[in-house]
């Protein structure tokens, strides 16, 4: 008998996470490493676990994640979004609870491009009147 996985894709900034969940003992593996090893900062680990803690499913699923692109913060957000979508795929009843917490909505904020003639996206060169 094949093990059935529930799948969710999460995105944040330029990071993309592919998340597979199956009933298990609560192991979270990101790119072949345990979550505590992959995310060096405590905030990253906390962000990843938020949907599970909120729905009371911490320790009930084995989660396998492939994440590419972006930095540590963007990847943590992408994994959270992916776990949220995978949980909804597992049980649609969780959707309203997750939406109320703001985990279902994709954070659309992206880095603004640098403009010609400016130092950064909006920072201009210092102007001297005299």
From Swiss-Prot:
Keyword Ribonucleoprotein: yes
Entry keyword Ribonucleoprotein: yes
Source organism, top-level taxon: Bacteria
Family of this protein: Belongs to the universal ribosomal protein uS9 family.
Annotated InterPro entries: Ribosomal_Su5_D2-typ_SF (IPR020568), Ribosomal_uS9 (IPR000754), Ribosomal_uS9_bac/plastid (IPR023035), Ribosomal_uS9_CS (IPR020574), Ribsml_uS5_D2-typ_fold_subgr (IPR014721)
Gene Ontology CC entries for this record: cytosolic small ribosomal subunit
UniProt signal peptide: none
SUPFAM superfamilies according to UniProt: Ribosomal protein S5 domain 2-like
Biological-process GO terms, alphabetical: translation
MF (Gene Ontology): RNA binding; structural constituent of ribosome
Name of protein: Small ribosomal subunit protein uS9
Keywords in alphabetical order: Ribonucleoprotein, Ribosomal protein
Pfam family name, one: Ribosomal_S9
């Amino acid at each position: 008998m094949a093990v059935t996985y529930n799948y969710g894709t999460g995105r944040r900034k330029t990071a993309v996470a592919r998340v597979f969940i199956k009933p298990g003992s609560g192991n979270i593996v990101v790119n072949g490493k345990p979550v505590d090893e992959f995310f060096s900062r405590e905030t990253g680990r906390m962000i990843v676990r938020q949907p599970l803690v909120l729905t009371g499913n911490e320790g009930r699923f084995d989660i396998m994640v492939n994440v590419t692109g972006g930095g540590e913060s963007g990847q943590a957000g992408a994994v959270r979004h992916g776990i949220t979508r995978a949980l909804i795929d597992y049980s649609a009843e969780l959707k309203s609870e997750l939406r109320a917490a703001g985990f279902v909505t994709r954070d659309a904020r992206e880095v603004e491009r640098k403009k010609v003639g400016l130092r950064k996206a909006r920072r201009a060169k210092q102007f001297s009147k005299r």
